[in-house]
């Protein structure tokens, strides 16, 4: 699956390299994916003192994992009708990597380099609003 986005400064093409969903129950599931991104740079300016050349392509991989939290299994007590909540706890992480020298240098010189990886455990999602959306 490919998705494209374009602005006056750059265009982005996203491709799903792999997507693996393993589902046994709401307390035992995981999603693992790898996405490829190609940025084509059209701008003439970049605020960090390093600019890709006009028309240059930058290549990145995004690794993503999403799974049920082992610390908070999904159970009847997750349903809270008084507060219109269905608490669902997940853990997720992602990591962004440059695939070529220009993309790697961009990470080194910019704020993007500090935000290349992220992980959070036991994040609570309220499924109630999603349920209402599906019903409507």
Curated annotation (Swiss-Prot):
InterPro entries per UniProt:
Lipoprotein_3 (IPR001595)
Pfam families linked: Lipoprotein_3 (PF00938)
Q: Which family does it belong to?
A: Belongs to the MG439/MG440 family.
**Official protein name in the record:** Uncharacterized protein MPN_649
Superkingdom of the organism of origin: Bacteria
């Amino acid at each position: 699956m490919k998705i494209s986005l374009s602005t006056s400064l750059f265009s982005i093409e996203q491709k799903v390299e792999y997507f693996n969903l393993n589902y046994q129950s709401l307390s035992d599931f995981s999603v693992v994916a790898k996405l490829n991104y190609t940025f084509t740079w059209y701008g003439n300016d970049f605020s960090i003192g390093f600019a890709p050349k006009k028309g240059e392509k930058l290549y990145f991989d995004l690794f993503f994992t999403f799974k049920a939290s082992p610390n908070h299994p999904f159970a009847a007590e997750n349903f809270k009708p008084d507060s219109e909540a269905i608490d669902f706890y997940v853990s997720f992480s992602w990591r962004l990597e440059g695939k070529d020298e220009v993309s790697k240098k961009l990470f080194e010189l910019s704020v993007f380099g500090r935000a290349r990886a992220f992980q959070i455990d036991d994040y609570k999602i309220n499924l109630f609003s999603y349920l209402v959306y599906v019903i409507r």
